[in-house]
Each structure stands twice: as C-alpha cells, then as structure tokens.
Amino acid sequence: MKKALLLLNMGGANSLDDVEIFLTNMFNDPYILGIKNKFLRKFVAFMITKGRLKTAKHNYEQIGGKSPLCELTAKLCEKISSLKSEFDAVDFAMNYTSPFVKDVLKKYEKFDEIVLLPLYPHHSQTTITSSLADFKKAKEELKLKAKISLCEPFYDDDTYNKIIISHIREAIKDTDISDVSLIFSAHSLPRKIIEKGDIYEKHINEHVQILSKMLKEQGLNFKDVSLAYQSRLGPVKWLEPSLNEALAKCENKKALIYPLSFCIDNSETIFELVIEYAKLAKELSFSFYKVVECPNFSDEFASFILEKSKNAREFSL
C-alpha cells in the first residue's frame, strides 16, 4: 500500500514573473472574492491585479524577487521525509502558484492513500476550504481513486503551541521583557466573511487565549499580550484592531511580533512585518521591534507534522 503526505498552502510568487499569476489566481478565487458570477469575478480580479501589480512587484524586489514559501516548504518536506514514517512520499502543493495541486497529484495517481495537511493552524473558507476545493477539482479531473484523509486545524494542539512558545523564548533570550509588548499578528479578513459564518476569528481568539495562558505558566511575563490584524486591503471593513493601530498605541515603544496565522515564512512576514512595519515602528520611535520566525522546517515542527498526520481522518470530497 503506497501512501503520501501532501502539505497544502496558498502559494507565493517564485519569481517576479509569478507575481501577476499569484494575484490573478488569488483574486479569482470565489472563496477570496465572493462574486458568484465567474465572468464578473474574473474581470474584477483582473482590475485589482492591474492596480496592485507594480506595487506588489516592488515589494517582492525588496525580499529578493520571490517569496520564500516554496523553498521553505520543500525543506520541511525533506526534513519530514528524513524521519521514520509510514509515508512513501512527502510533498506539497499550492493554490495560486506552482507547484499546483493537479501537477503534483499526477505523481501519485497510483498511490492508495493521500493524507492532506493544510498548513493553516486556523480554519477559514479563504484558506482550508479553498485548498480542499482546489484539491477536489484536481482529483476529479485526474480520476484519482486513492483514499483521502484530512488533518484538522491545529491551533489548539499543545505540541504545536509549545513550538510557538519555544520560538518566542528564543527570540527574546537575553532580553528584559518586562516592558516589551507581545503582539500576535494575524492575517485579517473582511468582516463580512466572518458575519457569513467563517470561524477564523473564533479560532484566532481562542489561540491567543491558549498561548497567553502558556506564556504565564512558563514565566514569560511580557508587559502585555495582545492581538492585532495585518494585510488589510481595500475600503471594506476588516477585522480589528489593525497592527498599525496596535503599534501606535504601544506606549512603551517595545514590541515583539509573532505571525500567528502562518507556519511558514512568506512575503507577509518577511516583507510586511519585518520591513514595512519595522519602518512604522522606527517612525514611532520604537527602541525595540522584532518579528519571531515561523516554525518553518525546524526539527520540532517536522516531527509535529508527522505526528499530526497520524490523526488524519478519512475525508469525502
């Protein structure tokens, strides 16, 4: 019996030429841009992409011309593959840029089971639901007969949260944190998506509560711990408070940022948080501003993913 573990994620531009592909595919996703008429959605996606392309390319140029997401995920797969497991293959696929799901699945047409693990700690229709819909379409087009199993969101998993605490501890070693504010920065969503029943905000709030308790239990006593949202786009109402607002209200001018929505570093961590918000912190006269790295391909995260995969349940697409 041949078995594969497939990690799912959104994707990120692998080159400057990929930026337009990424934006077009993302904004044409009905789970992102909720316009039912596909022709109208395609037109709106084209207009948004056209308006953002120049700025987006400039942003990518500042981080080496590409997102680190695919490279880091490939290293995570290699790390997992080096561990003893029941899997004959460990791979990854993306929604909006290569490697696309359909292309990856072609390698596993003769496999008996594929275990899906979306690399999103929290559930949202814009992430997990979208990834699974993409997978379902590819599976049907390829007429794949393999059994499909799915791993659930893991924001409340004790092992995962211990990894987060460990990364936070490493980031502030030799630092007096009694006057440092810890801000958990989550990717924002339009408020209307939450109002339609998306449970993302609920998961985020629960996650912050869990981590806040663990921090106290481990003696990591920051001045305060709070939640803020990043990556707002357009004039609609988004989840609040924004990270801009949180930094502006930070009277002690010292902040440690943890990117709560991500397991793997990407343009929204290494550009938006590390570069853009660092500039804002400097303008606000911060004396300490630091962003914690995501778990990425660390040994403990690779081991966690492998252990988590054992709890996958058969899933009907």
Swiss-Prot record:
Pathway: Porphyrin-containing compound metabolism; protoheme biosynthesis; protoheme from protoporphyrin-IX: step 1/1
GO (cellular component) term, any one: cytoplasm
Protein's UniProt name: Ferrochelatase
Function: Catalyzes the ferrous insertion into protoporphyrin IX.
Subcellular location: Cytoplasm
Keywords from the UniProt entry: Cytoplasm, Heme biosynthesis, Iron, Lyase, Metal-binding, Porphyrin biosynthesis
Annotated Fe cation binding sites: H187, E268
SUPFAM superfamilies: Chelatase
InterPro entries in UniProt: Ferrochelatase (IPR001015), Ferrochelatase_AS (IPR019772), Ferrochelatase_C (IPR033644), Ferrochelatase_N (IPR033659)
Enzyme nomenclature, EC number: 4.98.1.1
GO molecular function terms noted in the UniProt entry: ferrochelatase activity; metal ion binding
Reaction(s) the record says it catalyses: heme b + 2 H(+) = protoporphyrin IX + Fe(2+)
Any Pfam family: Ferrochelatase
The family this protein is said to belong to: Belongs to the ferrochelatase family.
